[in-house]
């Protein structure tokens, strides 16, 4: 309830240093995220909503100098200052665990092809480099390797092996069925007489996943989240409202399509999490 300046040094709990003295605040990010979540859930959160912890750069600035910190984190500090009106060079930042993106991804072979012949996967959507949880600051590795080296060679090599083979006719039943399915989905989204914008469903889905399928999970929480996602998915298709038409660029329609995919992905993520009984990287 007090301002930061009113909290004495003796009262401040440097919980990472306390829990992991060998690593301190250099603990791996999944461990640091779980520790922050634990502190917040225990009622020790800070800020107006009591849903964050402090990240104090004073020692780093004192040791390395403001110029070095600005070179490394300047853009981040500017975004934080614009969002909060607080200067992270002068006072600690308020941070909390949040969804980044799905880690790991589709199984693929050495040539980046999935179990579906002809379907390739690149970047962090695959599983070849990082496994279930990559190291910090390594996100571009898979994108660069796949984009510059693997896929430009693997895909032409695969296509060369198809030379002379008949392609699927555009009027084949499989193609017609797939096209009709997509058109039907778009038609439903555009003409559905609902009342709720896609962004609202997106936010509610995030809240469900953050609470039940976040950095720390339990069987009870996952089952509750699965039920909530299924209910939200039904509500989405019943009450979503997309403004505009489908005969020109429509960002609301694009967003609705993505939210529909997110709802399906969320259900799969939770189902998979329930099937895994042991901790594994981002699943804890």
Residue ranges and their predicted role:
Residues 3, 11-103, 116:
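C-terminal catalytic lobe of FAD-dependent flavoproteins
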């Amino acid at each position: 309830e007090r301002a930061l300046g009113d909290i004495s040094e003796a009262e401040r709990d440097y919980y990472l240093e306390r829990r992991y003295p060998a690593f301190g605040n250099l603990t791996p990010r999944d461990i640091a995220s779980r520790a922050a979540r634990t502190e917040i859930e225990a009622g020790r959160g800070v800020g107006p909503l009591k849903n964050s912890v402090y990240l104090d750069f004073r020692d780093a600035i004192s040791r390395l100098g403001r110029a070095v910190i600005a070179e490394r984190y300047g853009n981040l500090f500017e975004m934080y200052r614009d969002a909060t009106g607080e200067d992270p060079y002068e006072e600690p930042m308020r941070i909390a665990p949040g969804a980044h993106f799905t880690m790991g991804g589709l199984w693929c072979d050495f040539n980046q092809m999935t179990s579906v012949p002809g379907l390739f996967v690149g970047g962090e959507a695959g599983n070849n480099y990082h496994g279930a949880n990559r190291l910090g600051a390594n996100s571009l590795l898979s994108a660069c390797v796949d984009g510059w080296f693997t896929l430009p060679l693997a895909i032409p090599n695969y296509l060369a092996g198809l030379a002379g083979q008949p392609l699927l006719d555009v009027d084949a039943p499989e193609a017609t069925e797939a096209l009709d399915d997509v058109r039907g989905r778009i038609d439903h989204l555009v003409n559905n007489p609902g009342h709720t914008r896609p962004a609202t469903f997106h936010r509610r889905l995030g809240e469900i996943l953050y609470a039940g399928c976040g950095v720390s999970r339990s069987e009870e929480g996952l089952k509750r989240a699965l039920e909530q996602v299924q209910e939200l998915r039904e509500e989405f298709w019943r009450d979503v409202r997309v403004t505009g038409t489908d005969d020109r660029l429509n960002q609301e329609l694009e967003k609705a399509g993505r939210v529909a995919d997110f709802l399906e992905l969320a259900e799969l993520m939770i189902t998979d999490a329930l099937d895994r009984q042991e901790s594994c990287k981002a699943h804890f």
